[in-house]
Amino acid sequence: MDWLEKQSISSVVLVSYGTFSNYDAAQLEELGNGICNSGKSFIWVVRSNEAHKLSEELRKKCEKNGLIVSWCPQLEVLAHKAIGCFVTHCGWNSTLEAVVCGVPLVGIPHWADQPTIAKYVESAWGMGVRVRKSESGSLRSAEVERCIREVMDGERKDDYKRNAMKWMQKAKEAMQEGGSSDKHIVEFAAKYSSI
């Protein structure tokens, strides 16, 4: 967190692709080069069981603009004022954490509900973009770089941030007493408490 404290507001990209996502070495290189080539400061979470897949060349390249860590307190980092973008697999928990922190997203979905969530992030909520994979399903560094630049510096960057803040506010309202989530929990408890 000390490193993050020294960064400008909304200048850092957090990259975390979930507990179960598994990239091979070539795909990690593509992801890493896309992150580094974006020119943005970043924190990249690479699980300790995958760190051996990173080339020494990529590690050195990453040292110029960012940090590679094996773990971070994701919600705490997302809530930090320096975070401007979250590159994620679009798992539901990670997406909700970004929503409640008002952070725009770059989605790289893999399976299950992730492609649907990424579509919502991009098309319905307007708070980010999806990385388009190659025809063979491979990640390409140029596309990762393009998406990060689009969210951080593109013509629609203010729209992504404004929409992220709008959804953050809606999430907070839903959780407050009398909000939709609060009401549904009360209804659920009332319905099933007698069983």
Annotated model-derived regions:
Residues 1-195:
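Catalytic core of nucleotide-sugar-dependent glycosyltransferases
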